[in-house]
C-alpha cells in the first residue's frame, strides 16, 4: 500500500498511558502523538532512535499525528500501527501474494462469526469451496533472532483461536495469519514464555486443522507491502 503522503520523522522520547508517545521533531520541537498499538510493544521502544508518523487533517482529532514506524539501534524497521496489518493482508490476498489464499470469489472484512460473538478479520467466500476464515495478527517482538507472538498475555487472542477451531469443526477453513512488521524477524513462533495458555491453544488449533502462516512486510515511510512467506515454528 502506498501512503497518501510520506511519513514525517522525529526521535522517540517516551511512550505512556498506552496510547500516547512523546517525540522530538526534526526541528527540535517536542510533541505528543497517538500510539496505535495496545500491546506491550516489548523490544519496540528505543528511546533516542528515529520514528516516523503520519499526519491527519481531521480537525476533530486531539492528536493529529500517529506513530507508524520505529527504528531499532541495529537499523531494523518496525511497523508500530497494528491497525495496518489487516489492510496489508487484504491487499496481499487481492494481489495474489499469499499463495495459500488464492482462488476465492469474494473478500469481506469484520464479519460476525462464532459462538463467542467475534468478528473475523477477513472472510473469503466462493461458490465452489468452503468459506475461509482468516484471523490476522501483527508480529513485532524480536528476541534472540526469533519473532514471537503475543508480546503480552492476550485473552482476546485465545478467544480467536477457539473461534477458528470451531469453524474447522463446522467444515469451514480457518487460517491464522501472522503479519510480520519487523524487518529483523525471519521466523515466527508462539511466545510460551509470555503467554503459555496462548501457546498451548495455538498447538491445539494447529492439531485440529487451523492453518498457521506468516508473511513478512517490507515497510518504509512511503509504502508498506507483504512480500514473502515466513516460516512458523509449531
From Swiss-Prot:
Cross-referenced CDD domains: SfsA-like_bacterial
InterPro entries hit by this protein: SfsA, SfsA_C, SfsA_N
Highest rank taxon of the organism: Bacteria
Coiled-coil residue windows: none
GO MF entries: DNA binding
Gene3D superfamilies attached to this UniProt entry: 2.40.50.580, 3.40.1350.60
Any Pfam family the entry gives: SfsA_N
Similarity field: Belongs to the SfsA family.
Protein's UniProt name: Sugar fermentation stimulation protein homolog
